[in-house]
């Protein structure tokens, strides 16, 4: 069997989107499961939409997730040519010339306004969808020569008639299209750049891509690409078209929807655990046979079976992603967690750091959340919290019961306060937490108090002396 080779081929038009990250991840898992190669290449021929730094952003965010390509523009294998489309224009022109020589493609002189007029006529005749008619435009050879000089032309493929293009989709099973449903389409634009459907075929062939996993919006592109493979007498890869990702209401994710953070960069900046997102994305349209959810990268690679890719849309549940991050945070070593935190010039002994980390990582979702908790100890805030009469009674009792300043003695004082005042739950803990930490929520109370240090807690409790 030939080596499995998959690819993720984004355009450098912005940050790595959740949808793109999932596609890259599935391609990566597929390749690694079969001991193959995962390739990153760049579709950068749409110059107007390219964003400076877009390529670096894509690669950096993939690396942060743990998706490392075997080949990329930064790690090329010269055997497979260039990894940026903008560097392959001569190669595309070479393939275009092959098609022109065989009369499988032709030059089309339609101006944009002429195409619009043809579409309008098609609508008026009652056709459901527009199909380009190469015989519609009637212009003289003189006009053609003029348009040649002004680069007012494109190249179109001559689609075959009465041919069925079909493939066994890795996700959806058998899919077929009649060539009669597809009009001659543009393969080279007037700016001398190839179109997506043309360039992607050349790239996949040159890089010997064996399997393509991509979004379902590309289903309609596949028969066009298969036509090119036929004309060029090349073997096509196997295709699989992933279902859409929706929000929790079932609406397809849109980059224009600013109410939902949809870019990996957002979650990276918030301090999510990278592998938590890796794990979460792997289950966004795929399940393991044993229905296990929390899995290492090694497990996911081992268990990845493309036959278990979902045929139904997947919901992007931020709460579920946070759940994964919380689990991975909890299971990380204190040393690993501390490496992501800025203790500034804090010179306390290592046991303080250990207690802080052990206490707060139990309930934290992100490193940013942990850093905010740490900052509260490094730069203690003043309080505007007001205690009522019942709460004051609890705090005074706690203060009277606190004999020495250790975690164990603080807990003993809390327990004795509960016993003496016959209190439990919020009525017991909230007044003590507010008086000592100036917060209404937090982790295990005795440790949260201890971490502020005896001097500061003594000062805070002194406010509540008789």
UniProtKB/Swiss-Prot annotation:
A motif ('HIGH' region) lies at residues 10-20. SUPFAM superfamilies: An anticodon-binding domain of class I aminoacyl-tRNA synthetases, Nucleotidylyl transferase. It is found in: Cytoplasm. It catalyses: tRNA(Glu) + L-glutamate + ATP = L-glutamyl-tRNA(Glu) + AMP + diphosphate. A motif ('KMSKS' region) lies at residues 252-256. It is an enzyme of class 6 (ligase). It comes from the Bacteria. Its EC number is 6.1.1.17. ATP binds at residue 255. GO terms for cellular component: cytosol. InterPro entries: aa-tRNA-synth_I_cd-bd (IPR045462), aa-tRNA-synth_I_codon-bd_sub2 (IPR020751), aa-tRNA-synth_I_CS (IPR001412), aa_tRNA-synth_I_cd-bd_sf (IPR008925), Glu-tRNA-ligase_bac/mito (IPR004527), Glu/Gln-tRNA-synth (IPR000924), Glu/Gln-tRNA-synth_Ib_cat-dom (IPR020058), GluQ/Sye (IPR049940). HAMAP family: Glu_tRNA_synth_type1. Belongs to the class-I aminoacyl-tRNA synthetase family. Glutamate--tRNA ligase type 1 subfamily. Catalyzes the attachment of glutamate to tRNA(Glu) in a two-step reaction: glutamate is first activated by ATP to form Glu-AMP and then transferred to the acceptor end of tRNA(Glu). Monomer. This is Glutamate--tRNA ligase. It comes from Mycoplasmopsis synoviae (strain 53) (Mycoplasma synoviae). The gene is gltX.
């Amino acid at each position: 069997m030939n080596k499995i080779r998959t690819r993720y081929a984004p355009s450098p038009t912005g940050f790595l989107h959740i949808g793109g990250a999932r596609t890259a991840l599935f391609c990566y898992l597929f390749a690694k499961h079969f001991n193959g190669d995962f390739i990153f290449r760049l579709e950068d021929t749409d110059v107007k939409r390219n964003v400076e730094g877009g390529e670096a952003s894509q690669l950096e965010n993939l690396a942060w997730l743990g998706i490392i390509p075997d080949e990329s523009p930064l790690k090329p294998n010269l055997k497979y040519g260039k990894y940026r489309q903008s560097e392959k224009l001569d190669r595309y022109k070479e393939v275009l010339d092959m098609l022109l020589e065989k009369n499988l493609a032709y030059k089309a002189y339609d101006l944009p306004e002429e195409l619009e007029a043809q579409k309008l006529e098609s609508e008026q005749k009652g056709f459901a969808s527009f199909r380009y008619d190469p015989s519609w435009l009637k212009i003289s050879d003189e006009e053609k020569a003029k348009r040649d000089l002004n680069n007012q032309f494109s190249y179109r493929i001559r689609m075959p008639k009465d041919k069925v293009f079909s493939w066994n989709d890795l996700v959806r099973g058998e899919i077929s299209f009649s060539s009669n449903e597809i009009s001659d389409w543009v393969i080279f634009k007037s700016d001398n750049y190839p179109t997506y459907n043309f360039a992607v075929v050349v790239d996949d062939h040159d890089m010997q891509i064996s399997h393509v996993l991509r979004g379902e919006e590309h289903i309609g592109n596949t028969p066009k690409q298969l036509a090119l493979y036929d004309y060029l007498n090349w073997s096509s890869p196997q295709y699989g078209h992933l279902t859409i990702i929706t929000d929790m209401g079932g609406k397809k994710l849109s980059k224009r929807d600013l109410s939902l953070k949809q870019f990996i960069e957002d979650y990276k900046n918030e301090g999510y655990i990278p592998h938590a997102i890796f794990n979460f994305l792997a289950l966004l349209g795929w399940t393991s046979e044993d229905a296990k959810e929390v899995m290492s990268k090694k497990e996911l690679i081992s268990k990845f079976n493309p036959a278990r890719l979902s045929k139904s849309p997947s919901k992007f549940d931020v709460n579920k992603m946070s759940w994964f991050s919380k689990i991975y945070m909890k299971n990380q070593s204190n040393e690993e967690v501390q490496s992501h935190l800025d203790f500034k010039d804090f010179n306390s002994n290592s046991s303080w750091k250990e207690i802080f980390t052990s206490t707060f990582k139990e309930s934290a979702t992100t490193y940013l959340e942990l850093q905010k908790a740490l900052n509260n100890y490094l730069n203690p805030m003043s309080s505007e919290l007001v205690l009522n009469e019942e709460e004051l009674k609890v705090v005074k009792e706690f203060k009277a019961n606190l004999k020495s300043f250790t975690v164990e003695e603080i807990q003993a004082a809390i327990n004795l306060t509960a016993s003496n005042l016959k209190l439990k739950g919020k009525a017991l803990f909230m007044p003590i937490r507010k008086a000592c930490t100036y917060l209404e929520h937090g982790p295990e109370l005795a440790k949260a108090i201890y971490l502020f240090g005896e001097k500061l807690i003594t000062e805070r409790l002194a406010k509540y002396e008789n």
